[in-house]
């Protein structure tokens, strides 16, 4: 039996003038036909703007079709008389858990929808307890949601939907803002619910999540272009990449080996599958050679750009909620370095970086920029913020001006620069971030997601900070958009010599770009070393709630079975090179 049926669905967003006349139409869904059987686990992939979220919002009646029909258990979602039946059948979980939590106590938040439905108190108590136990959060029922980690908050959001006893849960990028441990927690919950018969529709940009589904749908330009089991979808590497999508690292490794003439299947999805196939190959022995260090193209020197001395920061000092976010951290960052900053949610990463440009003032300790304490009485904290630029996660929320040009120019103008110098910096920053000249006169709110992100970055770069701090600059972008933004940042770093601090939950991105990695754990500095050195401690990283690249996990499995690629396998290219050396030895 199908729980969701979509027949020739079309939807367009419309812009109206003051008189209610349509001034602009943007068709987002174009003739979608889809059936989802009860109990299925479906992953939906597609680049930003392809229509994934718009389609999902039709499943529980948040949006109504412009034309065509959507049925949930035979009920037309356009039928307003039965809209509450639809929404009780299909629950929805969004990307940002903070936008979904409404109460000050966990169990009250989970009970919120049930109270609105008029469910008897005894039944509310039973359902709330059951939902919290299902997502393994019963022990936190009396906690305040804002004190929980991202993964815990998202599980509370899922519990709130689960308490309504839906037959289907639609999750729109529920792990986009989570660390690796948080992602694992949420995916474990999703799979558990599916095993209990709940239909799951998961929208994601993470391919390792999509491979866990029973069915994968790929969208592009408002249409479904691929629909099959994960093995058959991800075996089509070139087609997926042409649509701005990625494949699991092990799938891409096998694809690259096959292109090099090695007889291996491409439709592998997990490290275990990949290892089994590689171990079948006849191979000689190879003494693993450590890869040469990355070429220094960024002008790193021993001159210190920023120094942190015995930094401690506490939130809510003097209240029952007092907590230490950063605990006695000391480190020095040299000029021209590209530093990756990693750590589990709540480890203190964001709190730490917000001290470098003076957004937060230490409870104790010192922050020095170019050898000068930024909180000395004679220090100009405003000037410090021009020297150390900070770009927040979802930086498009920093856009506010009428045009892209004015938005980028805002910082230089506030620095007191001349009109001529401001214009020069705006155009240079736009070029550095890959923004075409024609976009400068457009409203920033008319840009695509990736363009908005680059415009916000350009606004900080235009001030030419000596230190550029980036908090998850690629969060929420599709694989192609993510690579474009990060490549442009790296090119800017190489050309300008600017010191970069990149906060990320993607170990693959950190490995690709960072010279050194700063690891935070529970408010303390876990380690701060060269990238290769940090990721050679892969098992320790996993113990502190961090992920390691899938390709690294593969190398560990191979080593345990006699095929030693070395301790420094973090990229597909390096793994491919070592495997070819071994099988040809």
Protein language model regions, located:
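ABC ATPase NBD Q-loop/coupling interface
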Residues: 69-85, 366-383
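Catalytic Walker B motif of ABC-type/P-loop ATPase nucleotide-binding domains
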Residues: 169-172, 468-471
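Conserved catalytic motifs of ABC-family nucleotide-binding domains
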Residues: 165, 464
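Conserved ABC ATPase signature
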Residues: 144-148, 152, 443-447, 451
